[in-house]
Structure formats: C-alpha cells, structure tokens
Amino acid sequence: MSVVFALATPASRSALCVFRVTGAGCLDCLPDIFNLAPEKPRTFYNRLLVGSDGVIDSVGVVFFEGSNSYTGEDSFEVFAHGGLAIMNSIVGLFEEIGFDEAGPGEFTKRSFLNDKLSLSQAESVSDAINATRKDVLKVALNSLAGGFAAEVFGFADRVDGVRKFVEGSIDFSDEDYDFINDGGVVESLEVLCADFGGFVSSCYVSAENESKKSVLFVGPPNSGKSSLFNRLLGFDRALVSDSAGTTRDLIESEVFYNNSSFGIIDSAGIRKTEDKIEKDGVELALGKIKKADVVVAVFDSEDVAMKNELAALALDKPFLTVLNKIDLDVAGDEGVFDFALSAKTGAGISDFKNCISNLFKHTKVGDQKYFARSRHVRLFDSCLTSLQDSMIKIKAGEDLDLAAEDLRLARVSLDDVVGVKTSDSLLGDIFNDFCIGK
C-alpha cells in the first residue's frame, strides 16, 4: 500500500494542527525534512520542518515502527501551529515527496487489514467519535476494547463445536457412536440459542448516529433568527445585521446540550422579494420545513398570517413559536407564543433549550454492555434463525445435511460481524462514514 497522509484536525485556523502519515517507507523522509534520524520511536522530538522553499514551521514529531503503530505500518505524526499557510505548506510538501492524500477512515481501515483491529472494533472507533452521550460512549469503548469481538468469536467456536457432531453423524453414520444424542447436540443448541439471545440483549442498538435530528429557525426577516442561532451555539456563526435579508442561504451547525445532540439551521427571512438570490433563499427555507424534525418560528411581533402559514407547512412535526427581542419594546403579546426570550441578553433561553433537548431525549443504555450497529443486528438475527432452524431439523430427525448447512450459515453470519471475510464494497460502506485522518 502507498504512503498516505491526512490532516487529523479541522482545516481551520487554530492553536495546533496534527498531520498523520502511514505506509511502508514513510520514515525515510525524516532525515531530510526534519533533520531527524529515527532512533527512538514513540518519543516526542522538536524539530524545524523544512521544505524546498525553506523552513515551514517549528513542529513536534513522533514516529512509530511497524506493528507498534495504530495502522500496523511505519507511521509518524506532525504537530504544527494551526495556521492556514502552515497547513497548506505541509500538504504541498507531502505531495511533493510523493505521499497520497488519505481517504475517509484510511488509517483505521489499514489497522483492520493489518490485523490490528477486528472489523467490529474498527466500527467502534467511528461509534466512539460520533457518540454524543456518555452512556453511548461507554458501550462504544467497551466494543473498541475488544469485548464485543471476543464474545462473537466465542459463540462462533461454540457453533463449530456443535457442528462437528452433526458432521460426524453424517460422515460416520455406520459407527456405533450416536453423535447426536451422545454428543448432546440438541441440549447444546438450546443453551447456545439462549446464551446468544442474552448476548444480543446486552448490545445497545442506536440509530442516533445514523440520522441527526435537526431544528430549523424560520420567520420574517430581521426577527433575530441568526442571533438566536448564535446564542445556542455560544459563538457567532451566522452574520447578524440590522438590514433585512442578510441571511440568504441555510447555515447549519451542531449543538450538544443536556446530554442531547441536535443540528440547528438558520434560514433566510421569509418575505416577498424581487431579489433573485434572496428569493432562492426563501424557497430553500420553505422547502427545508418538510425535512426538519422541529420547526421554530421566530418573530419580533405578532404575525398571525405567517404563523399559520408556517404551521401548515410543518404538518404534524413539533412547531414552536418564539417571541424574540423582549429586551426591547416589542409589539407582541407574550401569551400567544410558546416562548418569549431575548437572544441578545439570554433571557428565557434556558427554558427554550431545555424544551428542544427534551424533544430529542434518547432511551438510556441501562445495563447494556456493547454498541451494535444495524448491520450487526441483521447478522445476529440471521445467526439465531439458522441456529433455531438447525435445532428444529435435528429434533424432527430430518436430513442432517440441511441442519449442518444451517450451522455453517450461523457461523458465516458471526464471521461477517467481526470481518473474518469481507468484501471490498462492505469495507467501502463502513469506512466511507469515517472522518479524514482516522
């Protein structure tokens, strides 16, 4: 495999940025660009990073050898200052050397291909990163630690243990030994099915990471939608202006509050306009109402006609009305709105945020130990069905060849969970959901 690199931190100005590089031969460049002879792996070195045009930055460098790295290949990481010019220069240098840009999940994919992680552990890396709740993070980390895969491998061995008696009964049917009865096949299958059902129940299945919930702010121009958007974020993400029609596109970001995570979307002020760009923004806002999970109509005065129009578009989804700018002498009866608040001063914001987060409350994890994806659940169902079908055939004295095939299919389902045999398309589906640099 080629040498690949990735920026593992966001591509925006910050205090630091981190680059990861992996692949056979990648350490050969260290003497030239860092003046560093690889001596002690997993040691932090402070060096000047030098490109063809001179010094790029004063950086930290750590390298890892082969099987002792995350990917199972020679690797190194660069910790530089987080300036855009510095990041661009480092990217240019790595491309000049001949390194390729890594794809999504490339580093974890290589870790799986080099037998550093099982497929279910690799998936748990993404689950841990995407977790927005502590209880979900806990079960994802349990899976990442290998407990989930170890249990699946254990059940696979037990399936093989039963299957060998069934196969023995087929291959040595003329022997005096009764492989089915003396081997306790039916009893073993009954216990196996019960234990496997208990294991499946110990897995937390969540669609939380598959479909992010969204809250859309709509309303007339200059009602304070962008100010409310920024207030929920805690920083200025959307442009705020006294001029109507400032927001012309959808602006999206994510909020984590009270153990709930949801996306918030600022939209163009809704009004009739001849400005083509603003008109397009209004159409975007109205169209987004059908897709959002919660619609929040923001006003700075009573507007019954627009309120009714927006409520009709929201259909049966939660529709909340907000009277903003209560710090001013607004022309509105607070009693006809769900919330009265000030995005500027923060008055009334807590009650509003609590309401939104309560709409997205998730089922608690409870005593469940592992994180299971929908892919795993489908395979678990297939495995349990195959085990039960095999037991039914054996109890009925039917063709043991078919019972043995059911047991083989049960084992295949378990192998697919941990990635004993995987197709390129499956790996693509899994790792394309990862972020770049992981």
What residue spans do the PLM features occupy?
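A glycine-rich (often HGG/GG-containing) alpha/beta subdomain
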Residues: 1-138, 142, 146, 320
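Generic enzyme active-site microenvironment
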Residues: 264, 298, 322
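Conserved nucleotide-binding/hydrolysis micro-motifs of P-loop NTPases
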Residues: 12, 24-25, 65-69, 83-85, ...
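Generic detector of well-ordered alpha-helical packing
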Residues: 75-78, 250, 267, 301, ...
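Inter-motif core of Ras-like GTPase G domains
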Residues: 278-301
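C-terminal-of-GTPase-core extension/linker across diverse P-loop GTPases
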Residues: 2-11, 134-256, 273, 291, ...
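Switch I (G2) and immediately adjacent beta-strands of P-loop GTPase domains
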Residues: 46-65, 245-273, 294
